[in-house]
């Protein structure tokens, strides 16, 4: 027997063909959401408050300080929030201290700071009753970046940019004349020496002393001449910078100093963030810049006078490591004191080293480092600017390297916590201005924190983010896999990110640093390709937001691959050589072969085993969760694998789903972490279990109660239904499944079914990827799904009186009311068809001038006889089904309703949809098709043992698409079915062709795994042997029921009076310009005239035509289309006197604008009137017309 048995949870064993020992379990797959939010609650929120506060008033006599904050209990539970369309949020209370500096008086007070949405255990938020997800954003990391560009003459120029988290950009660039310039905040460029002089180093010699001799420095100094001798060089430089930043304003050195301080050196206005400081220090660090250079001076320990490194030594990694302490300490540190006119007058500490130029061995190049400012320094320092300039000048000397912006060391993830902190900061900054004004205006003695704080800007910022940000998305809830994928999504779009139109090919492309961090397969097709990605299965964020991936460490001394796991970012990985997970190992953990396949900085090649530093932990660390669910992924073309991964996320939950015979072993973990199942929180014993709830007695005696969700409507209209898995008496461990969620079976993801599939053509019905299906799959509800739709009706107060929910509806027979209760609301369990009343509702009509008789009736019977019109909620087209639930909300019951609404009724209708012709089906390998024919079981081809085939696919769909994985799955699936086992074949480590044929033979199948098939209609065998097997097929969310649409009479557009378009508006089919040409070409003038008049916008014509058809009279001639009248009115509005004349030169009267207009938006009323008129004439008000 090939393979070995593996247990997945308590309910499923699979035969696994993996050969690689897994040394690391998959992390919790939604930790990117939950950990980030927890960090925000624990520390992120506190940091935001500490950033903005304390706030002083303008005279600095009062100060508002932050003390702490506390979250109280949420107002609603999760379930209540869903039912009431509320948000699941907790009130936050913040303690402030108001200090009066003149009197020393201190007032401390707790202030309510609004309701803050709280993340559920599943990593989602409930906002206004809907489940939402905050997608993590992939953005360019703050830091310093260097780039090179070649001009049209082939000359290489260099550029550099310091990008902060917030604040102004500082850029450097060279031109064709070898002069270096700087730009501040995208303004016009100035020589870089101007900025150096503004920083207080004004002499030419001083500048050369800092940066060393080079052509760029000399050329720039020559260009930067002293124009105004009455100013000092520093003042002149400051004025020049001010002129660039504020053109047209009077320039003084003082205003320029304060402007530059505000732009770069004030931590409130300029923020590199922790990650930016880390990146700047890492890039400008002297150790990486000295690596492999030849030192041109003796390095001497200042304290002892000992020579650490002699001139002429190559600074290899080992040399640098030997003097690392000195490099991090005071080795070659120089203190430069700026002159008195400088922007910042504190002394500037730099580290300077001289090395031999790599281009010209006779020249010496100076390397200037920023002496590693502390991590807490979030603004730029003059040392940073000088060190950046030095690196930039060194690039022209062949030192240092330019940055690749698409490298994942330069792109980071902003997860939920950080996005929320940014929003909160924006709100607090708006609040700060408000607070400062109130503190200054009001009387100091009576002020309390409560009085000066207005929380509205903060709550508005948070609300806006959750409600309308591009990154706050309605959760994709088609099935558990789509939930899980959505929570792990990484988007490069959104505020502060890229835009679709500007993103080029490079940003979207797969980069070598994506390995183990972002999935190279799973991304949408279309305009967002490559901009929306998914986290790889083992990906994990570090504290700076860079994605790490785990590797097994290789002990270089013994050559053994240890089980020690090291998490590396893309930057760190660049320094090492990493071997693949499938490298053969001996029993003792050493490499079995001298040469192994490995990667180093994007080069995939063979390496000697002795130079390998790390080994991948698992073959599936390259791909995302959805991709890791595709068996035989290694045999599929990547374009089709992309479709396969995306289509699994569109699978509809079936009534009785089955886990795949051929899985990958990911099904258990994906189901477990998705949040759709019920998972035990503690160990214990089941003491009660039914469909609605499970009770578990813990070992300490306390009782856990788990509620099972039954048929709740999911975000995408499918049934979210959980099924209990445990019985009374079962022993449960923490993490065990208590109930399956939708699309799960026995604790495993089960998106579809395992039908018997044959690759063969049949009467041409599977042309172009169409799917032929057996009627068995319809009759036995194999691909049946339940869909829930929600309809609501509300009663409001109108000017003419309140609307009412009632059974007494005008002009409706008793038959139509048979399923309504005494209030006029449909009963639960009623079967409804389109047009049936769900909630009876009447709205008062405008009173006409009453006749004497009517006034008398009013006086006698009170208000009863006034006119009302029927505004009942009816079942829309395609909405028939069974009433699953009715919820009623009224003010009397204490429900919160919108203003003006007295009562809200919600009706849920369940539909059972069997699979039918036109539904879309797919396998897991990107093989998708539409059901073209459902064939009776007796006509389907059958196997020699009499088993009819369930599905026939077109064999031509395989070769050109190069997704051979489906054929391998087919054969292995048949073997698994015959053996009665389930199989796991993990990606890149699955069943080999030998394993496949061994299993086929073990199952007693023919050696080619094909079989003779017999035609069900004739009983004759088909000419050739056919590949028949079991393939996992899923039904996708694109169902024909949602797309089929027909209209006879419906709403019209208000201005043009043409039918609306689209299924949602119950619109008509557009007969466009080209279609008109077709009828013109055939000379079909009458048909064309009908289409352009009656069937479109001839208002009176269509009424008369309707009347004529219902009475059986000849149809009258059409009139003038409404759109023509609109045209006439447009021309008249331009001042042109446009009239329409008939053939006898008499003016044709056009319908006037106000004629017959109602206050309704859409015009179906005219037709209704015609119907009523006809009904009165014939006087046959029978039950049957009532029912309709």
UniProtKB/Swiss-Prot annotation:
Listed GO CC annotations: DNA-directed RNA polymerase complex
Q: What is this protein called?
A: DNA-directed RNA polymerase subunit beta
**Taxonomic lineage:** Bacteria, Bacillati, Bacillota, Bacilli, Lactobacillales
Pfam families per record: RNA_pol_Rpb2_1 (PF04563), RNA_pol_Rpb2_2 (PF04561), RNA_pol_Rpb2_3 (PF04565), RNA_pol_Rpb2_45 (PF10385), RNA_pol_Rpb2_6 (PF00562), RNA_pol_Rpb2_7 (PF04560)
Q: How does it assemble?
A: The RNAP catalytic core consists of 2 alpha, 1 beta, 1 beta' and 1 omega subunit. When a sigma factor is associated with the core the holoenzyme is formed, which can initiate transcription.
Q: Report which reactions are catalysed by this protein.
A: RNA(n) + a ribonucleoside 5'-triphosphate = RNA(n+1) + diphosphate
Q: Which organism is it from?
A: Streptococcus pyogenes serotype M5 (strain Manfredo)
Q: Which cysteines are joined by disulfide bonds?
A: none
What EC number(s) would the UniProt record show?
Answer: 2.7.7.6
Instruction: For this UniProt record, give its keywords in alphabetical order, as a comma-separated list.
Output: DNA-directed RNA polymerase, Nucleotidyltransferase, Transcription, Transferase
Q: What class of enzyme is it?
A: transferase
Q: Name one GO molecular function term.
A: DNA-directed RNA polymerase activity
Biological function = DNA-dependent RNA polymerase catalyzes the transcription of DNA into RNA using the four ribonucleoside triphosphates as substrates.
For whether the record's keyword set contains Transcription, the answer is: yes
Q: Which domain of life is it from?
A: Bacteria
Family membership, please give it: Belongs to the RNA polymerase beta chain family.
User: What InterPro entries does the record point to?
Assistant: DNA-dir_RNA_pol_bsu_ext_1_sf, DNA-dir_RNA_pol_bsu_external_1, DNA-dir_RNA_pol_su2, DNA-dir_RNAP_su2_dom, DNA-dir_RNAP_su2_hyb_sf, RNA_pol_bsu_bac, RNA_pol_bsu_CS, RNA_pol_bsu_protrusion
One BP annotation, GO: DNA-templated transcription
């Amino acid at each position: 027997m090939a393979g070995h048995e593996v247990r997945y949870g308590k309910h499923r064993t699979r035969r696994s063909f993996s050969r690689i020992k897994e040394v690391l379990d998959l992390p919790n797959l939604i930790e990117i959401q939950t950990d980030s939010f927890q960090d925000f609650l624990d520390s992120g929120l506190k940091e935001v408050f500490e950033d903005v506060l304390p706030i002083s008033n303008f005279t600095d006599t009062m100060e508002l300080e932050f003390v702490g904050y506390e979250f109280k209990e949420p107002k609603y539970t999760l379930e209540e929030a869903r039912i009431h369309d509320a948000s699941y949020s907790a009130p936050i209370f913040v303690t402030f201290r108001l200090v009066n500096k003149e009197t020393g008086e201190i007032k401390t007070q707790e202030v309510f700071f609004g309701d803050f949405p709280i993340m559920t255990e599943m990593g989602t938020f409930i906002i206004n009753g809907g489940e939402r997800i905050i997608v993590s954003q992939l953005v360019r990391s703050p830091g310093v970046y260097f780039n090179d560009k070649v001009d049209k003459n082939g000359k290489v120029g260099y550029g550099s940019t310091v990008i902060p988290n917030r604040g102004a950009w500082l850029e450097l660039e060279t031109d064709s004349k070898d002069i270096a310039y700087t730009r501040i905040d995208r303004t016009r460029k100035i020589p870089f020496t101007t900025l150096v002089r503004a920083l207080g180093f004004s002499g030419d010699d001083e500048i050369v002393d800092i940066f060393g001799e080079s052509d760029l420095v000399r050329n720039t100094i020559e260009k930067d001449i002293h124009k105004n001798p009455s100013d000092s060089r520093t003042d002149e430089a400051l004025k020049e910078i001010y002129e660039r930043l504020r053109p047209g304003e009077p320039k003084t050195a003082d205003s320029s100093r304060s402007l530059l301080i505000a732009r770069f050196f004030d931590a409130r206005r300029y923020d590199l963030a922790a990650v930016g400081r880390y990146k700047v220090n890492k890039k400008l660090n002297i150790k990486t810049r000295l690596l492999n250079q030849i030192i041109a001076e003796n390095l001497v320990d200042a304290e002892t006078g000992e020579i650490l490194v002699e001139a002429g030594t190559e600074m290899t990694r080992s040399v640098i490591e030997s003097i690392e302490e000195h490099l991090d300490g005071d080795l070659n540190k120089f203190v430069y004191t700026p002159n008195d006119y400088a922007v910042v007058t504190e002394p500037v500490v730099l580290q300077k080293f001289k090395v031999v130029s790599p281009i010209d061995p006779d020249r010496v190049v100076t390397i200037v480092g920023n002496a590693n400012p502390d991590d807490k320094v979030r603004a730029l320092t003059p040392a940073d600017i000088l060190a950046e300039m030095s690196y930039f000048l060194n690039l022209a000397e062949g030192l240092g390297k330019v940055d690749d912006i698409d490298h994942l060391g330069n792109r980071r993830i902003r997860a939920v916590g950080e996005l929320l902190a940014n929003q909160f900061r924006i709100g607090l900054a708006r609040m700060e201005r408000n607070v400062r004004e109130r503190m200054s205006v009001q009387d100091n003695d009576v002020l309390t924190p409560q009085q000066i704080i207005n929380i509205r800007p903060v709550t508005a910022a948070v609300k806006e983010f959750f409600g309308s940000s591009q990154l706050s998305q309605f959760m994709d809830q088609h099935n558990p896999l789509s939930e899980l994928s959505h929570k792990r999504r990484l988007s490069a779009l959104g505020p502060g990110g890229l835009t679709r139109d500007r993103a080029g090919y490079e940003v979207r492309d797969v980069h070598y640093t994506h390995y183990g961090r972002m999935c190279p397969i799973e991304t949408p097709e279309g305009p967002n390709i490559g901009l929306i990605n998914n986290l790889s299965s083992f990906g994990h964020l570090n504290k700076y937001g860079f994605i790490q991936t785990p590797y097994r460490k290789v002990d270089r001394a013994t050559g053994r691959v240890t089980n020690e796991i090291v998490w590396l970012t893309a930057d760190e990985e660049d320094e090492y050589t990493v071997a693949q997970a499938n490298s053969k190992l001996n029993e003792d953990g050493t490499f079995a072969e001298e040469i192994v396949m490995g990667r180093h900085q994007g080069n995939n090649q063979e390496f000697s085993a002795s130079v390998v530093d790390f080994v991948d932990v698992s073959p599936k660390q390259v791909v995302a969760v959805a991709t890791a669910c595709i068996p035989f992924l290694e045999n599929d073309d990547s374009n089709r694998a992309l479709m396969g991964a995306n289509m699994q996320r569109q699978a509809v939950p079936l009534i009785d789903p089955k886990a795949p015979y051929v899985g990958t072993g990911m099904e258990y973990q994906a189901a477990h972490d998705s949040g759709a199942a019920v998972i035990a929180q503690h160990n214990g014993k089941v003491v009660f279990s039914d469909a609605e709830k499970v009770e578990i007695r813990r070992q300490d005696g306390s009782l856990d109660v788990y509620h099972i969700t039954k048929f709740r409507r999911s975000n995408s209209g499918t049934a979210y239904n959980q099924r209990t898995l445990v019985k009374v008496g079962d022993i449960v461990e923490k993490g065990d499944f208590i109930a399956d969620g939708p699309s799960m079976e026995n604790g495993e993801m089960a998106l579809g079914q395992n039908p018997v599939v044959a690759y063969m053509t049949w009467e041409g019905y599977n042309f172009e990827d169409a799917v032929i299906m057996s009627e068995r799959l319809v009759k036995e509800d194999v691909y049946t799904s339940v869909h829930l739709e929600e309809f609501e009706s509300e009663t409001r107060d109108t000017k003419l009186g309140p609307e009412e929910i009632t059974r007494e509806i005008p002009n409706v027979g008793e038959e139509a009311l048979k399923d309504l209760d005494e209030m006029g609301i449909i009963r639960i369990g009623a079967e409804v068809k389109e047009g049936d009343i769900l909630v009876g509702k009447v709205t008062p009509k405008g009173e006409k001038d009453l006749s004497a008789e009517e006034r008398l009736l009013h006086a006698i019977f009170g208000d009863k006889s006034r006119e009302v019109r029927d505004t009942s909620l009816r079942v829309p087209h395609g909405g028939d089904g069974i009433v699953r639930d009715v919820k009623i909300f009224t003010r009397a019951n204490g429900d919160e309703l919108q203003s003006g609404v007295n009562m809200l009724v919600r009706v849920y209708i369940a539909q059972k949809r069997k699979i039918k012709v036109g539904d879309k089906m797919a396998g897991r390998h990107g093989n998708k098709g539409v059901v073209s024919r459902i064939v009776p079981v007796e006509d389907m081809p059958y196997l020699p043992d009499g088993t009819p085939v369930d599905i026939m696919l077109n064999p031509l769909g395989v070769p050109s698409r190069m997704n051979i994985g489906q054929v391998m799955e087919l054969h292995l699936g048949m073997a698994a079915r015959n053996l009665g086992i389930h199989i796991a074949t993990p990606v890149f480590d699955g069943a080999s062709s030998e394993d496949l044929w061994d299993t086929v033979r073990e199952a007693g199948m023919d050696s080619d795994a094909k079989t003779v098939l017999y035609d069900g209609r004739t009983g004759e065998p088909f000419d050739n042997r056919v590949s028949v097997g079991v393939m996992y097929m899923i039904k996708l969310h694109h169902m024909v029921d949602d797309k089929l649409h027909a209209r006879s009479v419906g709403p019209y557009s208000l201005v043009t009076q043409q039918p609306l378009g689209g299924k949602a508006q119950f619109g008509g089919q557009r007969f466009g310009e080209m279609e008109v040409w077709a009828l013109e070409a055939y000379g079909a003038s009458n048909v064309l005239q009908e289409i352009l008049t009656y069937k479109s916008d001839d208002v009176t014509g269509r009424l008369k035509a309707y009347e004529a058809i219902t009475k059986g009279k000849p149809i009258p001639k059409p009139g003038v289309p409404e759109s023509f009248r609109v045209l006439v009115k447009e021309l008249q509005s331009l001042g042109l006197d446009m009239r329409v004349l008939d053939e006898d030169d008499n003016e044709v009267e056009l319908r006037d604008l106000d004629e017959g207009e109602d206050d309704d938006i859409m015009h179906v009323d005219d037709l209704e009137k015609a119907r009523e008129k006809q009904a009165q004439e014939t006087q046959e008000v029978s039950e049957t017309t009532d029912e309709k």
